[in-house]
Amino acid sequence: MSTPPVYITAPARERAPAIVVLPPIFGLEPAILQLADRYAQRGFLTLAVNQFWREPETRVMGRDAVERPRALERAGKVDVERIIDDVGIVIDRARAHEGCDGRVAVLGICFGGRYAFMSAARHRIGAAGAFHGTQIGLELDEGPRVACPLSFHFGALDIQTPPDEIAAIRRVTAHRADAEIVVHDGADHNFAVPGHPAYNPDVAARAERAVLALFSAMPAYR
């Protein structure tokens, strides 16, 4: 069986919790690999997924005026069900990795946020997180099936995820007292992406601390 390509980076300790990172529409761009390396330095086995490996163009795309429209077009044509199935394959791969202690979380960034939310409802994970996740509102029917803690972080200035969508996410996850949905004042889309003009180091640090604390405390899936 073919499996999605992943970028794997491991911490110094022998066994650790794993994070499956689901990137933005541009793919495994340098900023995402930088984040993956940082999570490994903080004690997590990290697997960053190329969600576009089935598409005609699998490569990393740029954020410039030429490449961005192509990235948006590619993202608009994906098969959502195939991607979420692929995420499940990577979750199983992470759990079976010799460096994993049996605990696996999913972290979605931008485009990846939708699949982090779906993973919380469909896959065997201990927790899910997201930084300025998009299109989660398309999957609200998954909300009542969310079966793990959440730590999802949005920017108050981010027009890609308006207040009514965030309110709906809160509503459909209200059955879980451990569903943390946070809106950060003064933060815009891409607040967590190093090197982006909207990168907000203070907000990014707060959001990252919350997510990694959740992932550190998560139990193994049973």
Roles of regions detected by a PLM:
Residues 1-222:
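N-terminal cap/leader regions of alpha/beta-hydrolase-fold enzymes
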